[in-house]
């Protein structure tokens, strides 16, 4: 009887031990990731995300929309609180020249220009305001080039050699950064597509699974949906354009990730084969940014 009781107690202890080692399902919420900027959209961090039994360190890996309208207060916040030491700008050359970043403190600026068709061909259009741009998108929602942008944008980002070269430069530079010296921030225009793809790649390098990568991407949709929902659309094409180019479209993004997996086996394999991020480099990044 005593022996049986001892066995039961041992089993119970093992069960409790197993439960304490199980990583609880994390709840990803936009409010927990925002970094307090009021003059830049979609400004948030990867810090706090749980990867296995570790988590990403707070206040080191930041992402946002363009920083051209950064206020003095927000610039000070990035310089003093986050000690931003490098800005990675994924906007095309014409985008960044027409709206140059405000550089916080003594941060280093690196242009990683990744352009889509219109800018590269010299056919890009200047808009006086956001309403004018939205009006154009609605008017030409059925145009083949606009539809192609919606359906193939992430394929361009992940599979075109020129895009891959941009992300090679991103990782090569990031590996030279010492996190004890402060944060880095990367952005594009809205901080959701080119910057979002950089985030997905970095999360994969840090060991994140598809679920976490998609959860981070979806936060851009959560951020922009309140704005895009106010735009009146009349056709399915218009809805698709607004949901993809003004908000974020996780269905299209995940379809590209599926193509990556089909061709390379995993996003981490893709990073090694196409971006040149070796397993050893990934280990360096994990040592620096996980705790």
Label every PLM stretch briefly.
Residues 190, 194-195:
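Ser/Thr-glycine-rich phosphate-binding loops at phosphate-binding pockets of nucleotides
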Residues 1-23:
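Bacterial Sec-dependent N-terminal signal peptides
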